[in-house]
């Protein structure tokens, strides 16, 4: 469950290390983002020489949340951290590698490129 001012780790190799959510996309009254939702973030921490700089405003998709997510079969999935992957304007990932596991819900939300780059889909 991601809302405004939530800090997230970055799960790709774009050079950003930490993000701050500044808007949840999907309507003016939308308060929370869950697995597979798109958010607007600002980069709070980045490595030198990376593709993104500190203070840059970027779009990202949520790939891991601490809040448990109920699946249609009745099982629950949750992770140890909140993490996101940075997106280009066309919805493709900006990085070329994804770190850590991602949720199966991204396949249903049509983020196939992220699913194919991920080392593990849970």
Swiss-Prot record:
Entry GO MF terms: large ribosomal subunit rRNA binding; structural constituent of ribosome
GO BP, sorted A to Z: translation
Gene3D superfamilies, sorted: Ribosomal protein L14 (2.40.150.20)
Any one GO CC term of the record: cytosolic large ribosomal subunit
HAMAP family referenced in this protein's UniProt entry, alphabetically: Ribosomal_uL14
Described function: Binds to 23S rRNA. Forms part of two intersubunit bridges in the 70S ribosome.
Family named by the database record: Belongs to the universal ribosomal protein uL14 family.
Protein's name in the database: Large ribosomal subunit protein uL14
Organism: Cutibacterium acnes (strain DSM 16379 / KPA171202) (Propionibacterium acnes)
Gene: rplN
